[in-house]
Amino acid sequence: MAEILGLGVTHWPTLCQPNEGLTGVFKTTLRAPNVEAARKDPASWPPELLAELGNDDGLSAAHRCGERFGNDFRAIRKILDDFNPDVVVVWGDDQYENFREDIVPAFCLLGYDPDFEIKPWHNGNGGKPNRWSEPADWALRLHGHREAAKFLATGLIERGIDMAYAYQPLHHPMAHAFTNTFLYLDWDRKGFPYPVIPFAVNCYGRNLLHAKGGLAHLFQPPRPADEAEDPPSPPPWRCMQVGAAVAQVLAASPYRAALIASSSWSRTRSMAPKLLCPSTWPGIRRSERR
């Protein structure tokens, strides 16, 4: 009998790294040529940020952050274990990992093999230390659910959603939005036994191919003025339609399904109103209304 559990998690900041590395993105941003010099000046930073940096370059705050997130993910994992799903559908963005010049769908669900593995420290971590002190050849073992993926894709297409799907990766084993989600949900490394269906979304839209994902947009020159923009990401109303259709399909399925929305929490919330990246202001406005 169909049952649905909804959960929300973050797949960023860089919780994969030891606490000493949690300020890495912030420091990278300060070196970026596309960030205004005035915003790199500590004199312009709010007191909350300066307090977190403290006199140890943010290490104490990073330890508190790591402990909090670890406990939060343990709590979410317990909810998931108590529900004991037949399948776990995870929404996340693809940042030029498999959505590249050869194909950029708005959405794509992944019906991977019943047993597959990913080597997160070999594929994308660049040899950096990780929080769990795992070697480069350590493998995250996961399970796909192709039958459920086919059921979901079929139901979406029948409801007017032109759903792309794939049974194997095209360029990268798995987008970090999904890899990090599964790493964090298995914080204590007891294994992740539930079959998964990653559901990739083109959140980068017009900037995906030019920026090539990640933080590259902070370093690359702007698009030439005479070059036409790439198509946008799916609009919010379409995302709502897709989400509603997913709920309808799974409600009519034989599966106990956990639906997990995986995103990144704002890295600029405490920077308002002096933002390193002004385009993040709408996200802060939304946060203030919650």
Feature annotation, model-predicted:
Residues 3-290:
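Active-site histidine-anchored catalytic micro-motif
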